[in-house]
Design a protein with these regions (language model features):
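Glycine-rich helix-loop "coupling/hinge" segments at transmembrane-helix boundaries
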Residues: 64-70, 147, 246-274, 308
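Membrane-water interface segments at the C-terminal ends of transmembrane alpha-helices
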Residues: 31-64, 79-198, 222-246, 253, ...
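Glycine/proline-centered hinge or cleavage motifs at structural transition points of membrane proteins
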Residues: 211-212, 225
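Transmembrane helix boundary and interhelical loop/hinge segments in multi-pass membrane proteins
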Residues: 69-72, 152, 196-206, 215-217, ...
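A short amphipathic helical element positioned immediately N-terminal to and/or at the very start
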Residues: 71-81
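C-terminal transmembrane helix and the adjacent membrane-cytosol boundary/short C-terminal tail
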Residues: 2-16, 194-205, 209, 278-308
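Short coil/turn motifs that cap or connect alpha-helices
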Residues: 165, 213-215
């Protein structure tokens, strides 16, 4: 009996090699990596290198420039000395920064809400009005405040000319410093907050309203949580700028308040004590860096940048 064999068709075998997996070298030579090289170089030269230099100087002997010939903790010991007034300056800076954040959050929120929901076609014009002062030097704007509020200045002279006793003497006092910081840093709180509110879908607000939520519940449970990334970024920017503010304290406050940035400036210039100034800068940088990491750990940057 003849045996029959069944032959099964076989698929043609491709002789082409499978595409190789991308290697680290390919990743380094990718278009995105090449395009980011100028930014990386700029950050390395303009940001990382100065930080390393400041950190190295903080361990040098006081009033010397011998960075690599000596190592001492005297500068940090002087900072953490209980009798050092630098902590009072640091507390003033913290107080101004926190007060600026809190007040600007209250001031900027209605404006940001108006830019998103109320102003309509006028939103661009209103935004330009807030951006335009940034094209003028901060010192010029603050000296304009001095000319306006100083004794026999614009306000005081005008009131006397009209027969009144004159304007209030509010210049060179802490409240005036805070007012100047509110004026200068308002855009840095406003625009991130506007971006955060723009991320709130109108459908969710309409759905919450249809389900019986009142205006307070919608604001508390829908708008604020979804807009929180933009609000936190605005508060972080304002706080970092506020804790490093020196022009407002010097121009609007005179010598009534000494902030930490002023102490650092004096150490580097008048006292010529670069190691102490570097140690102060390192302490402030570590504090701001820790705060920044804490804030960014609560942010969804992918959602904020529109990636998902």
């Amino acid at each position: 009996m003849a045996q029959t064999t069944l032959s099964h068709p076989t698929a043609p075998v491709s002789l082409e090699a499978a595409p190789a997996l991308p290697t680290k070298r390919d990743a380094l030579l990718s278009l995105g990596a090449r395009c980011s090289l100028p930014v990386i170089l700029l950050l390395a030269v303009g940001f990382v290198a100065p930080l390393i230099a400041i950190f190295a100087y903080s361990f040098a002997k006081p009033r010397t420039f011998e960075v690599f010939r000596s190592f001492t903790l005297v500068n940090y010991a002087e900072i953490f000395n209980g009798s050092n007034t630098v902590w009072l300056s640091f507390l003033w800076s913290l107080g101004f920064a926190f007060a600026t954040c809190a007040l600007l959050a209250v001031i900027a929120y209605p404006i940001a809400y108006g830019l998103n929901r109320v102003f309509g076609k006028w939103s661009s014009l209103v935004s330009i009005l807030f951006v335009f002062p940034l094209f003028v030097s901060e010192n010029v704007r603050l000296y304009g405040w001095v000319l306006f509020f100083i004794k026999n200045g614009v306000l005081d002279g005008t009131l006397k000319m009209l027969g009144f006793e004159g304007g209030p003497q509010i210049l060179f006092q802490p409240p005036m410093i805070l007012a100047g910081m509110l004026y200068v840093y308002l855009p840095f709180m406003l625009f991130p907050m506007t971006l955060g509110l723009a991320m709130v879908p109108r459908d969710l607000i309409d759905a919450a309203r249809d389900l019986g939520a009142n205006r307070w519940q919608i604001w508390r449970e829908v708008e604020v949580p979804l807009a929180m990334p933009g609000i936190l970024i605005g508060m972080l920017l304002t706080f970092v700028l506020g804790i490093g503010a020196v022009a407002e304290a010097k121009i609007l406050g005179g010598q009534s308040v000494i902030v930490i940035s002023h102490d650092i400036e004096i150490a580097f210039t008048y006292s010529q004590n670069w190691p102490l100034g570097s140690a102060l800068a390192v302490v402030v940088t570590i504090f701001i860096g820790a705060l920044t990491l804490a804030v960014f750990s609560r942010l969804d940057l992918d959602r904020l940048l529109g990636r998902r």
